[in-house]
């Protein structure tokens, strides 16, 4: 009997999901993306060679693994084709292994224009989107007016819908945002060119997943972004436009929760965030700069510098509850090497002095101060360790304390960027 394993982020994204998905796909017949778009950036390092994936599931670098893009993913055809071409230039066979749901919404040029125009108009109050058109594409989906991958293969129907959409969106772009209109014919011609390339890769992904399940195959579900960026459970409004938590798996793939066997929460050994929004443990001192430098904390999609701070057990407890986490994978432990002391946030103190748990929206974070528990650091290197016994005693104590504070077991520890720099204590597919 096969197992269905989920890999998702428990913080604000950038937790190191790509490496872990790549590591675990050794046991998987298929990997499926179920939400987000090319705003994701999953970095894989294999034998020292770095590859960044945005839309294509991280299993593509494992020979023979089927890669599926589910209905919950918003697909930018131009970005997808660029990614396919780059991988093919490296000798990776993509088209015979990649399949895309016809129900996946399309991101087109007017979505990108709207996204960027809105951020520009917000000025200092900007949310910090990637400007890739993700939000506007999900808006069209929910408003039941969006174009989907399957529409690409019906030219007349596509053209009629596109004309209506451009009338609607160009009115906003020109009259409200004072930006140029998007050209209908150019957009149509581009989309029809992409249609010819995408048609062989279209497949009913939901049906395929259930066929694999019934055949007893192991399947991996690859999340994008992090739990605290979830449209419903994140630090709203500083969130993404999809459900990054476990609930998004079923809606974005068509595989019900009863069939999910193990949910692995990828968790960085410290905390980072890109863009605007609350971040209680953020560091503005030399330690924060050290974490950013050692951890190479720059967004793989946008190149923006990530904000860095101490580990926050409060937000992790919330993520564990919301996602029904089975086990934690602790990443970037080696970045903490050499720090004399390490702080863990165990609660938030409000203006009345009461210690509380994580709020549900961004405004409620105003005025909260982190309550820290100080732990000794370690001088020894953890880089490349492959067994728990190789880690310094202080590092093992740090890991144990995180388990105690969160109530979840740490099943995997990442000690470096390469797939073999990993300690596996309990395998999700076992």
UniProtKB/Swiss-Prot annotation:
Signal peptide: none annotated. Its cofactor is Mg(2+). Coiled coil: none annotated. Pathway: Purine metabolism; AMP biosynthesis via de novo pathway; AMP from IMP: step 1/2. Substrate binds at residues 300-306. SUPFAM superfamilies: P-loop containing nucleoside triphosphate hydrolases. One of its GO terms (molecular function) is adenylosuccinate synthase activity. It is found in: Cytoplasm. Keywords: Cytoplasm, GTP-binding, Ligase, Magnesium, Metal-binding, Nucleotide-binding, Purine biosynthesis. This is Adenylosuccinate synthetase.
């Amino acid at each position: 009997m096969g197992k269905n394993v989920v890999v998702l982020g428990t913080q604000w994204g950038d937790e190191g999901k790509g490496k872990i998905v790549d590591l675990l796909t050794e046991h998987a017949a298929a990997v499926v993306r179920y939400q987000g778009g090319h705003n994701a950036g999953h970095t894989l390092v294999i034998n020292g060679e770095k590859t960044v994936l945005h839309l294509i599931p991280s299993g593509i670098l494992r020979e023979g693994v089927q890669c599926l893009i589910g209905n919950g993913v918003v697909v930018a055809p131009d970005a997808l084709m660029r990614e396919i071409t780059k991988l093919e230039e490296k000798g990776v066979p993509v088209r015979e292994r990649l399949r895309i749901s016809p129900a996946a919404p399309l991101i087109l040029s007017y979505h990108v224009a709207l996204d960027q125009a809105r951020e520009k108009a917000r000025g200092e109050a900007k949310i910090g989107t990637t400007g890739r058109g993700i939000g506007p594409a999900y808006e069209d989906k929910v408003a039941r007016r969006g174009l989907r991958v399957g529409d690409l293969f019906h030219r007349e129907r596509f053209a009629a819908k596109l004309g209506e959409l451009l009338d609607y969106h160009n009115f906003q772009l020109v009259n409200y945002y004072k930006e140029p209109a998007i050209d209908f014919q150019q957009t149509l011609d581009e989309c029809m060119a992409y249609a010819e390339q995408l048609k062989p890769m279209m497949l009913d992904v939901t049906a395929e997943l259930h066929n694999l399940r019934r055949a007893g195959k192991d399947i991996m579900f690859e999340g994008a972004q992090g739990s605290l960026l979830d449209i419903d459970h994140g630090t709203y409004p500083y969130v993404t436009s999809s459900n990054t938590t476990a609930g998004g798996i079923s809606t974005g793939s068509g595989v019900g929760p009863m069939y999910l066997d193990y949910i692995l929460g990828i968790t960085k050994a410290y905390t980072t965030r890109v863009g605007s929004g609350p971040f209680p443990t953020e560091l503005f001192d030399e330690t924060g700069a050290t974490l950013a430098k050692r951890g190479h904390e720059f967004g793989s999609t946008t190149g923006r510098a990530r904000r860095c701070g101490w580990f926050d057990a409060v937000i992790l407890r919330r993520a564990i509850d919301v996602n029904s986490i089975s086990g934690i994978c602790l990443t970037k432990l080696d970045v903490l090497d050499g720090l004399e002391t390490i702080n863990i946030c165990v609660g938030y103190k409000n203006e009345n002095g009461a210690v509380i748990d994580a709020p549900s929206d961004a405004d409620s974070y105003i005025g909260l101060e982190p309550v820290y528990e100080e732990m000794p650091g370690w001088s020894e290197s953890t880089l490349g360790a492959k067994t728990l016994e190789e880690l310094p005693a202080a590092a093992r104590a740090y890991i144990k304390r995180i388990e105690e504070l969160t109530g979840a077991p740490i099943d995997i520890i990442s000690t470096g960027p390469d797939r073999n720099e990993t300690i596996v204590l309990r395998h999700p597919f076992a």
